[in-house]
């Protein structure tokens, strides 16, 4: 596969989907494959499923993998966990998947991945200024962009509204649970997006998630300063966006390594080796300290014995 290809894997609570992505066209290069998410969805079990999924495709060794993940991700580490086992919190997801699959893996918050796809190939591709992508589903995911640059992990579905997290008041799952009609739901969306406008003054708002296919039933009822439009890539957005991120990150990693083709996994190995060497040096220092302490004790003992002998002679 060429440098215009990367692999995307979308990890959800019930299914793990993946496919190679054509980064020129901004679409899946083949049909995607779906494997049920293992239960419990522990790091080890999910990593094994990700490996199986990748091996189901003819993926060249140098092709990077992007993974949208339902969590706040900082420097590859999961800080939260939604719809997956809580044992993910504190896990270095990048390192785990890279080690398990043999590919360089780059993990990103799932809403951020969808936003990246829309900014590259969808509703936000010509947008300037502040753009907010929202995904309406079980909860509310958000991705914020300023002049095309992602502000990661915004989690604006959790801003307070009516004394609780906003998503508990206006997510699509709430519409279904409370059996709200489209107009009733639009009233709640109006409250949420009005608050978002007050805080961020976006130039464009993009609405994604499965319910975006019904956008004509509720978006025209919203009265906002900013244009609000449906997402274009829908269910493929996460896979495509993560693949875009993976290819960009891989190219940056290679450039930072001096263009010698050295991958993140190699750098990670160097890091691990450096850690071991540091640990060994620490151990050597402790041993030296102990030896010096013993030498001092022996020296004091010798001086004491010499003093006794001298007194005895006198």
Enumerate the language-model features and the residues they cover.
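Active-site-adjacent loop/helix segments that line or gate small-molecule/cofactor pockets in enzymes
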Residues: 111-115
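General beta-strand structural signal in soluble alpha/beta enzymes
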Residues: 63, 67, 105-110
